[in-house]
Amino acid sequence: MQPSDVQATFRRLRQEADKVIVGLEEPFELLVIALLTGGHVLLEGVPGTAKTLAHLLQVKFTRVQFTPDLMPSDILGTSVFDITTGLFHLKKGPVFTQILLADEINRAPAKTQSALLEAMEERQVNLEGERHVLDAPFMVVATQNPVEYEGTYPLPEAQLDRFLFKVLVPYSGHDIEMEVLRRYHHGFNAHDLAAIGLQPVLTASAVAGARVYIQHVVVEEGILNYIVRVAAASRQSPDIVLGASTRAATHVLLAAKTFAALQGRDYVTPDDVKFVTPPIYRHRILLKPEAEIEGLDADAVVGRLLGQVDVPR
């Protein structure tokens, strides 16, 4: 596989996705980066991109609506007694898929949210003392309501850290919203993707091949140093209580390599690092109350960090 192959595949994905998704170029690109990096995504805002991506990949897709009464066994599965045989057998839960859409994940209590932890980190589930390996690729795309909504349970830090990206999906601008209305006026149905004529672009084996290629994308020592210095700056920032961890810096490295490959390059540039850092940091750093009172948010503070740290030449 060559850099141009990865880039061409991404362009085909984007072209097919455009049949369904209007705008949202960056959220879709971040979803593809997460898939090829082996990460998970937390979406805040309008959903819809995850189902489209799954349709383009020829992989299994499952959606779970998280609610306050959802139990861990509703996600992982449970043993069921078969009257005819007199034996228990495993009834697998919806986690046994390849792309899992966890809709409104912060509607469910922490115990249920944490049921995904092992699956997200280890790509396996332990049920009744038996280990069950999940099919590859396995990716969780979770949507959440903003924390000010009633009936929400904030995701615990351990759960947040499992997500490679937190992607903010904004409301559409005027031109994009007009295009959406035109499509619906002419009979568009977002719930019938087959009728739209979406063509699968990637197979599971192709995803695996792309991941192997991405591992060999070149990262110069200066780029590694840049990633480390940005992380260190977050820990020393007067606006931040909890800075980026080494794990976050590792995620920046891996995501930057994937983003470079999508651009048709076999090497990482500082701009690649700058592109992937905000969605990796925004759910990991904790701002001081004074910074929030000033009206700053995580993205503004991360933007400051990236502007302050010298870029390698």
Task: Enumerate the language-model features and the residues they cover.
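Walker B catalytic acidic pair
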Residues: 45, 103-104, 115
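Conserved alpha-helical scaffold flanking the Walker A/P-loop in AAA+ ATPase domains
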Residues: 30-33, 81-101
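Walker A/P-loop
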Residues: 32-67
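Pre-Walker A (pre-P-loop) alpha-helix and adjacent loop at the N terminus of AAA/AAA+ ATPase modules
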Residues: 3-46
